[in-house]
């Protein structure tokens, strides 16, 4: 929607494709890392649950800057997201990290979900708890990010 375009930052598959093309990354030529998923963090695995992305960002900031104040607000469901954006535009959330998930409960409860939101969230939480690392900045893959920066 053009009315929200300047207020909402998102990344779509088409845009990611453009980024990969610009960086000359051939995704189809990449080899699958069988340990890749097992090296994920609790935070990374919780991205699919409402509040999970913002919590991951918060945890990395707290690790690096423990005294920094972090204000966050999140919404789930389009109605609540719209309300959050309206309040943000009115200045109610200046300096806040905002997270909005279109689906109630987060992506884990998206259109293809075949079980209750609570059951889906519980399954994600159980899977996340088995991760080797708590915070995403503790995984081996963070070191690879420097290669993407000139």
Question: Where on the chain are the PLM-derived regions?
Answer:
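Single conserved hydrophobic/aromatic residue that forms the stacking wall/gate
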Residues: 1-5, 9
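Long, compositionally biased charged/polar accessory segments in the mid-to-C-terminal portions
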Residues: 7, 13-150
